[in-house]
Amino acid sequence: MGVQAKEQLWGGETTKAVDNFPVSGERIPVPLIHWLGRIKGAAARVNAELGLLDEDKANRIAAAADRVAEGEFDDQFPIDVFQTGSGTSSNMNANEVIATLAGDDVHRNDDVNMGQSSNDVFPSAVHLAALDTATNQLLPVLERLEASLQAKADQFKDLVKSGRTHLMDAVPVTLGQEFSGYAAQVRLGARRIQNALPQVAQIPLGGTATGTGLNTHRDFAPKVRALLTEATGLEIRPPEDPFEAQGNRDALVELSGALKVLAVSLTKIANDLAWMGSGPRTAIGEILLPELQKGSSIMPGKVNPVIPEVVLQISAQVIGNDTAITVAGTQGNFELNVRVPLIARNLLDQIRLLTSGCRIFAEKCIDGIEANQEGLNRSAEMTLSAATALNPYIGYDKGAEIVKQAAESGRPLRDVALELGVDEETYDKAMDLRTMAQGNL
């Protein structure tokens, strides 16, 4: 092996890119670096198998690329993520680092980049980094979050409370029904992500510069895909059309959209939980959120819904990232999209944020939620909308009059209803809150 020590391994093209793009101080995402290494290693092995690359060179290139893939040289990728839109600078960075590690007789372009172009390698690495992290990191965490929410749905299935629409009192529901809805949102969100991944798994590798495959062996791409699939367990696929795969990043835009929908769902869930846990004395107070830390530097005893607030901020960032990805996705002019580093940065950031956010949401919030029976009873008994259950017996207009008088006088619905002629047996039959919450279920 050529170089062992942690010295500067990149060459002149990387240095030029560092000088040209002093933009954000943010480097390309680490999973992308690792997938560049995996692709380069598989490419070297396949080129040797095809008789195109000296076997000894190929072995050294593959060994060096494997070390990049394992994260040993993350610090050797210094180029800003805001760089040339094809990712050429980072592809050259990978070629230079691997060539230096592999030995002086290894050429960064002729050997390490054999059969490849930045235009097919870099987006392929982005696709596979997204496929890998979504499959192996995000989806298992979503399964965990769904299970946590469903466990609470089962725990709270008999606890009746006031429903709310337009932030106003509505007919009763159970707390378990609300959590069942939250679990379904997460489950459906995971399904949307899963449905987007087969398209992400279609990579443009083998198209080289414009999708034609110029300067690459016709068996190169299938064999590289097979090696990567065998090594990772991911089902990596050929594109339906090489020019579609080369000229746009629609599959990544689609995945981002699914991630955005999940963020929208998490926003609803986190907001609901923060509202239901509000108080403890002057607001809704139907649930008790875990007390994790002091909520104020001036108000003693104050506790805030810190985990829902984190989830809300993560969701806002994910939605913002999706907007940037959507705009970047429109820049697939002719044979190449030239906003790929931006897409990579924002998409992998979405996956990372949602993975960590959903994990702490389950572990530090959902698992520890308890029902506040006093608050639930208060909301269930005080909602005037429960009078809706009287409609089949007395009609809408008379029910509306009962609600109006109860609201104006502050008297219980029962007292007003009996006073206006509803017999006691009818009232008690219609106004059983638990039966009411079941609706026609």
Identify what each model region corresponds to.
Residues 1-441:
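Conserved, well-structured ligand/cofactor-binding cores
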